[in-house]
């Protein structure tokens, strides 16, 4: 997490709230920082409260929304997308813009800095010309990008005041210590991993059972697929939501896993049975 751009995002949220702007109802928002220290310096700066008012509450830390754990869309929005076959957009400050990654119904995904994510959320659309079009209207007054964007001096003064090395040292001091639920997990100490036959998350793959040290040459190899444009690794092996109707979903259902506990392909990468059923299923 880049503290400078996150502080900028908080300042934009503060100005937006003070000017009376709100995120439109059809825009779903979430905030998943890469580190817990982010919450502390945003709270210390008095900015998280403004992000919360715009709907950017912290939903977790690390890979959450960007891996597909974004939760459901509003029912009306979902029905409109499916009925009218709409190409709707998500915009994130993560590092993946794959089709369907954020949500199966969201085809287009754009990457942007955190401040721009806030700005686009406020505008409620992706096809906006920030140079000439207003982001929103409050009390009859048009609000433009220039009205919300903080100055470099403002950001510099705030970062110098808030970002102290002690803040990071304190948060990373016990980096390997979890909460009470994590610490309560009972595990056997051993030099090798204790495979569980019942786990649907981590399953011992059979591929190395007959491992041989003998190396052989490969002759006349051929590509499995030759693909056109806009094909991503997610089309080959998805990382997002597991649908109940998919082969991977059926596999989990047969093992008494409920639909709301399917999680994502990304979270079940340690189970080859799930992943092989997800191949080319995007």
Residue ranges with predicted function:
Residues 49-56:
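Glycine-rich and small/hydrophobic secondary-structure elements
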Residues 2-28, 57-175, 179:
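Mobile "lid/hinge" segments at catalytic clefts and subdomain interfaces of large enzymes
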Residues 1-42, 46, 181-282:
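Non-catalytic terminal/interface segments that mediate subunit docking, oligomerization
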């Amino acid at each position: 997490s880049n503290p400078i751009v996150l502080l900028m995002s908080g300042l934009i949220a503060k100005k937006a709230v003070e000017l009376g702007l709100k995120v439109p109802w059809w825009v779903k928002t979430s905030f998943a920082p890469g580190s817990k220290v982010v919450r502390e310096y945003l709270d210390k700066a008095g900015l998280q409260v403004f992000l919360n008012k715009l709907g950017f509450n912290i939903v977790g830390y690390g890979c959450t929304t960007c891996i597909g754990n974004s939760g459901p869309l509003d029912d009306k929005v979902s029905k409109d997308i499916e009925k009218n076959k709409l190409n709707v957009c998500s915009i994130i400050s993560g590092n993946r813009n794959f089709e369907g990654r954020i949500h199966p119904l969201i085809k287009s995904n754009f990457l942007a800095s955190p401040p721009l994510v806030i700005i686009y959320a406020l505008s409620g659309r992706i096809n906006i010309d920030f140079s000439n079009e207003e982001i929103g209207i409050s009390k009859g007054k048009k609000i433009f990008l220039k009205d919300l964007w903080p100055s470099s001096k403002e950001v510099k003064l705030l970062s110098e005041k808030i970002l102290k090395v002690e803040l990071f040292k304190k948060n990373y001091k016990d980096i390997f210590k979890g909460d009470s639920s994590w610490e309560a997990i009972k595990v056997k100490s051993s030099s090798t991993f204790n495979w569980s036959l019942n786990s649907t998350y981590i399953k011992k793959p059979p591929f190395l059972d007959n491992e041989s040290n003998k190396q052989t040459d490969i002759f006349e190899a051929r590509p499995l697929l030759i693909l056109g444009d806009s094909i991503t690794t997610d089309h080959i092996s998805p990382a997002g939501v597991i649908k109940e109707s998919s082969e991977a979903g059926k596999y989990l259902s047969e093992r008494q896993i409920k639909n709301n506990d399917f999680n994502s392909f990304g979270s079940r990468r340690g189970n080859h049975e799930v992943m092989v059923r997800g191949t080319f299923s995007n």
